[in-house]
Structures are given as structure tokens and as C-alpha cells.
Amino acid sequence: MAVTDRFARRATLSRSLRLLSEFRYEQPDPARFYGALAADTATLVSDLWLAARGESVAGRTLLDVGGGPGYFASAFAAAGVGYIGVEPDPNEMHAAGPAHAGGPGSFVRASGMALPFADDSVDICLSSNVAEHVPRPWQLGAEMLRVTRPGGLAVLSYTVWLGPFGGHEMGLSHYLGGARAAARYARRHGHPAKNNYGSSLFAVSAAEGLRWAEGTGTLIAAFPRYHPRWAWWMTSVPMLREFLVSNLVLVLSPR
């Protein structure tokens, strides 16, 4: 069984449309948006683990790099996973307020590019929509592989710059260029975007991610995170994937 076989059966058009409908709530109602994304991500990781290892993910330890305020912790706890979140920004760690205070999992304030964990210390290392927010995404990826046990899974998912969501709250203006889009947003809103090009948002391509992952010798799957299964072929087509694979998932298994 291929590592993606189980999840591929869930990757339907209705799922894609349901998740797409939640994106408009990312800023006005983050609990709704991230709650839906967290549940879907926990299912994704559970399916990948079961297909790869032939056993339930329950009882395993997962390190979430860039875990934010803990929305994902609840979803993984419900799956029986031991959750550890890593987040460098104290504002992000407390963004959910009292709703997640004292919730499941444990949290560490640290950078994903220098994880304070021993080699081979977790079963699964996840990074969801973080790589495009750091200046050295493949250093983050290397750290994820370092802390993942042989036979475990490192799952790195990120927003592709030239896809329709690459500009985040700047909208499609990122097609004019990142710096120009950032300046335009600041003029219109009177303040920089939260995801500000050049400081908290960077242009990361699908080709870069695939090249890095293949170079590690540990890549076992790559597919568009939010697309239905019948559209996964786009990942294999240069240039097309940059515009139509809005979010790329890289699944790696250290040996």
C-alpha cells in the first residue's frame, strides 16, 4: 500500500469545497478556521501513519513545528496522539485566549530552524503552513528530519508562492511582486500585513520543495493538500504546479 492510499479516498471534491469555504474565516474567526483545518490535518496524519506503518497513530508522539495557540493539539489529542507544539512567537502561542488555556498537549517556545529536541526523539514531525513564513525553509525541514525517528514520518506542508493563496491577506496582488503587494497593502490598510513579504512571508516554490525533499533521499510522497485525488497529477507538471498546487505536502520517512 502506498502511503497516500488511505487519505486519497478522503480527498474528494466535497472535502476541497468544504475546506475552501472555511478560508474566509481565517482572520475574523480563527477558531472556526483552524478548528476545521486541525481536524482535517489530524485525519491526514492518521491516514498516512496507518498506511505507512500498518497500525494506529494512537500512542505516538507528534511534534508540531509552528503549532501556534493549540488548535491542532485538541484534534490530535482526540486521535490519542501525544502532542508537543513548538512556536517562536509568544503572541501566537496565546492567540486563542482562554479557550485553549490548560488544554491538551505541551508547548515549547522555540524556533523551528533550531529545534531543542534530541535526534530521533519523536515518531511524527509536522509543519503545517509554516515554511513560507521563515527565511530558511529547508533548514526547518532538515531539523524536522533530524528529530524524527527512523521509520517515522516528517510531514511538511506549505503554501506555494505563485498559487492563488500565496499572497495570504494581500490577495492576488502578490502576482505584481511581493514587495509591491506589501506596499500596496500597507497603503490601503494603514499598517503592514500580518504576513508581510520579506519579513514574515517569503516566496517558496513547489520546485524548491520537491528538489530539497528528493535530495534528502527520504521523500515517499508529494501531493496537493487541498485538491481532490483526481487533481494530484498537477504536482508532477513543472510550472503548472507553481500556479495550481496551492499547498504542497511533502511526506518523508527517515531511515
From Swiss-Prot:
Pfam families, per the entry: Methyltransf_11 (PF08241)
Protein's UniProt keywords contain Methyltransferase: yes
EC number(s) reported in the record: 2.1.1.-
Molecular function GO terms recorded: S-adenosylmethionine-dependent methyltransferase activity
Protein's GO biological process: methylation
Gene3D superfamilies in the cross-refs: Vaccinia Virus protein VP39
Enzyme superclass (EC): transferase
Keywords from the UniProt entry: Methyltransferase, Transferase
Family indicated by similarity: Belongs to the methyltransferase superfamily.
Protein's name according to its UniProt entry: Uncharacterized methyltransferase MMAR_0473
